[in-house]
Amino acid sequence: MVLSSQLSVGMFISTKDGLYKVVSVSKVSGNKGDTFIKVSLQAAGSDVTVERNFKAGQEVKEAQFEPRNLEYLYLEEDKYLFLDLGNYDKIYIPKEIMKDNAMFLKAGVTVFALVHEGTVFSMELPHFLELMVAKTDFPGDSLSLSGGAKKALLETGVEVLVPPFVEIGDVIKVDTRTCEYIQRV
């Protein structure tokens, strides 16, 4: 438990209505001299934002997360199946949680996840992954437009710009944060 006056942006709190991320916090003085803490909250796993008022000094339940390493297995209908490397449980993660991270997934990739009461609320890919080039442009097709680079389609479906010497079948290192080529492996 934390006091309402200790709430800060980025914290997660648990209420009877669910789990929320604190988006903004401000102190408001009431008519009778009472001070309230006005908080904008974003429902975990969605874009829905609500506003709540807490009395100054009111206790609020801070959500506790368990860090977990999960290994990606495969896509099953509209959910991604992972293996928890700590206890070997299977965990399904919906597409809404995966967002843009899904385009880098291939079997065997280990991700870092934050879990609250058995539910994954966020996950992070390794900063760098090694992926195989499935298709590339011919060197002359895109060189003039991109300053010496050509387009390459990777095994997961991601398209990146690569140097002209990269060929189909090469394994390259990609920065998952920027979707940029780093080096040939």
UniProtKB/Swiss-Prot annotation:
The keyword rRNA processing does not apply. The gene is efp1. It comes from the Bacteria. Transmembrane segments: none annotated. InterPro entries: Elong-fact-P_C (IPR015365), NA-bd_OB-fold (IPR012340), Rib_uL2_dom2 (IPR014722), Transl_elong_fac_P/YeiP (IPR020599), Transl_elong_KOW-like (IPR013185), Transl_elong_P/YeiP_cen (IPR001059), Transl_elong_P/YeiP_CS (IPR013852), Transl_elongation_fac_P (IPR011768). One of its GO terms (biological process) is peptide biosynthetic process. It holds the Pfam family EFP_N. HAMAP family: EF_P (MF_00141). Disulfide bonds: none annotated. Involved in peptide bond synthesis. Stimulates efficient translation and peptide-bond synthesis on native or reconstituted 70S ribosomes in vitro. Probably functions indirectly by altering the affinity of the ribosome for aminoacyl-tRNA, thus increasing their reactivity as acceptors for peptidyl transferase. NCBIfam families: PRK12426.1. It comes from Chlamydia trachomatis serovar D (strain ATCC VR-885 / DSM 19411 / UW-3/Cx). This is Elongation factor P 1. Keywords: Cytoplasm, Elongation factor, Protein biosynthesis. Belongs to the elongation factor P family. Pathway: Protein biosynthesis; polypeptide chain elongation. GO terms for cellular component: cytoplasm. GO terms for molecular function: translation elongation factor activity. It is found in: Cytoplasm.
